[in-house]
Amino acid sequence: MLARAVPTALLALALLAPASAGARPADHLWATVNVCDTAKAPDTLGVRGRMPGNGSHQRMFMRFRAQFYSGSEFRWKYVTKGGTSPWIEVGSARFAFKETGYEFSFDAPAAGTTFMLRGVAEFQWRAKHNHGGKVVTTVARHTRKFTEAGHRTRDADPKGFSAARCELKP
């Protein structure tokens, strides 16, 4: 399965509250499908994620990956070509949380077939350190989330859409 990755202008959303002032961090770590094969975005899977800040000077990054369900193998597999976004810097970990998203465009399924898709959001908190007179960046924490329903997001199509999976039809 091939995807034509289309980066969107879904810029990170910055809340002005410090990380210590918001809801529990677990409430701010998720991924959802917010676009699925609509008239405005045919044959497109949109994935959006949110990650919590931790009040530090770390920088937060997200990367999105597309998966398809292989009925013959009875398992989810990563889309190999065009199914991975670049790492997107979403901002400072001093804030309560940050959001961003990415859209994957696919060739339309052949008549009589469908593609069942989901997204995976990978999250990194990166820190800079002085090591032997050089500034180096390390990954202080990393995790991932599979898409799930129930998260209202900006730029959803249709408005308010949030799902765990996306089915592309011809």
Summary of predicted features, one role per range:
Residues 1-5:
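Positively charged n-region of N-terminal signal peptides that target proteins for export
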Residues 7-18:
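Bacterial N-terminal signal peptides
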Residues 22-28:
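Proline/serine/threonine-rich low-complexity linkers at boundaries of modular beta-sandwich domains
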Residues 37-51, 59:
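Contiguous beta-strand segments within globular domains
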Residues 60-81, 116-126:
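Short beta-strand segments and strand-loop junctions that repeat across beta-rich extracellular domains
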Residues 76-97:
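Solvent-exposed serine/threonine-rich low-complexity stretches and specific carbohydrate-binding patches
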Residues 94-113, 124-133:
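Signal that preferentially marks extracellular ectodomain short beta-strand elements
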Residues 127-170:
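Short beta-strand elements
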